[in-house]
């Protein structure tokens, strides 16, 4: 079996359930648990992109995948709270479960929401991706967690920094205490854009002077195409927001390069599946 473990993540196979865990977050395993699902046979899609319901069997399979992953990290899948993810910069604070005996998925309360924060124990915050960046946040001082989806549109809106700002302004966190872990996503090697998107990035990130920084953005030699490192952009703006360099932990894994184990929209096209990132504060 291919092992995705590296200096920042460990690849676990528990009773046939595969997932990654960040070594940094494992240092706090008495307080939190977390996972990023691995495998393209699992699919955590709970609704169509246009909000249409899934066929019953497909939804049931997603719930089974959630249950198996949650069981592997010893949390109750019925406590899953999932944002609907519409490439916004909106972040919710979850203070309680809404559905009593079912996961909180496809709820109007989390429509047009791409990030979620809580200080409540046992809630299992979930986001999903197939190339987009997912960020897990943890403040060990205030016992605050967050889970944020940042596609290229979310990155343009700086949703990662807005998550930090909400943790600071509304829940009493300090940026220097916050840990941010970046899950597998499409990387610069495969994130190719046309001039219209390139121009949007240049305009939004003038402060980074990205047009002159080939580590962030690089024009292809023979085409009007550009490769952009959205992960690096998030690292830089999070550091500017006050996070310590050593507290920004990157999985270093590209979804396209690892398409045999991680879902990728660019590889799978219309029938693409979704992986999930979970994080939960443990109860007493």
What is each stretch, according to the model?
Residues 1-284:
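Active-site microenvironment for binding and transforming phosphate-containing groups
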């Amino acid at each position: 079996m291919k092992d995705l473990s590296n200096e920042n993540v460990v690849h676990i196979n528990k009773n046939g359930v595969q997932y990654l865990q960040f070594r940094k977050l494992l240092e706090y395993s008495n307080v939190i648990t977390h996972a990023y699902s691995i495998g393209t046979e699992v699919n955590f899609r709970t609704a169509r992109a246009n909000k249409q319901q899934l066929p019953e069997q497909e939804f049931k399979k997603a719930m089974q995948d959630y249950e198996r992953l949650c069981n592997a990290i010893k949390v109750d899948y019925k406590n899953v709270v999932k944002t609907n993810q519409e490439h916004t910069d909106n972040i919710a604070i979850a203070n309680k479960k809404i559905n009593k005996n079912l996961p909180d998925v496809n709820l109007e309360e989390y429509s047009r929401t791409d990030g979620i924060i809580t200080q409540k124990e046992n809630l299992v915050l979930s986001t999903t991706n197939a190339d987009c960046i997912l960020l897990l946040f943890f403040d060990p001082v205030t016992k605050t967690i967050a889970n944020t989806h940042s596609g290229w549109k979310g990155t343009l809106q700086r949703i990662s920094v807005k998550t930090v700002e909400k943790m600071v302004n509304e829940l009493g966190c300090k940026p220097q205490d916050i840990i941010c872990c970046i899950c597998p996503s499409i990387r610069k090697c495969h994130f190719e854009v046309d001039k219209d998107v390139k121009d949007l990035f240049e305009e939004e990130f003038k402060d980074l002077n990205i047009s002159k920084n080939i580590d962030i953005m690089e024009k292809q030699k023979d085409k009007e195409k550009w490769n952009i490192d959205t992960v690096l952009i998030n690292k830089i703006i999070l550091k500017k927001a006050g996070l310590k360099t050593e507290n920004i932990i990157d999985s270093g894994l590209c979804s396209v390069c690892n398409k045999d184990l991680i879902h990728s929209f660019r590889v799978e096209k219309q029938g693409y599946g979704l992986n999930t990132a979970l994080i939960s504060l443990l109860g007493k």
